[in-house]
Amino acid sequence: MNSISNDKSWKYSNFIENKYFNFDRNKIFSVLSKKEIDGAYKVISNWEGYSSTPLENLNKLSSELGIKNIFYKDESKRFNLKSFKALGGAYAVEKISHNKKKITVSTATAGNHGRSVAWGAQRLGLDCKIFISEFVSENRAEAMRNFGAEVFRVKGNYDNSLKECIKQSNKNEWEIIQDVAWERYELVPKLTMAGYAVM
């Protein structure tokens, strides 16, 4: 087997360059504060089954590439979701539904975010409606159904599924739990990012 560094398809110099190495970390906290992240941790760490996930050192790969360390955060077993986005959507569901009568939550997704929203709704006994494009695999749709979500397949791509989610949610007074922001829709994506930050 060839090593990665000998494989001509890898653009080695571009691969290891990090154009954002000197980014201003304080800019992150101007959008999402440490207090908000700490609040997410306080809630999520009290969920049944919560535990830290491992940070793996990919020694062989870092050695082959001549990089001191490459770390991989293994989120695959978090709450049995098999998703790297396990925390964000579920946290947003909990925060948005707090102190409200029984609500229905909705989202558009290609899979991972929807799985988190579906699981978050299931653990709180809420109805969940998920909109996916025609290109999302049936395995992903089934994974969301397994957490109690009703899944709607929409003709077209992700953008089409998001438009349909917004349309149906407005019509039926469902709470949209989306991981992207738009004008006058920033709170839920911010809560989702706070959940991701717990990773």
Question: Where on the chain are the PLM-derived regions?
Answer:
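PLP-dependent amino-acid enzyme catalytic core
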Residues: 1-199
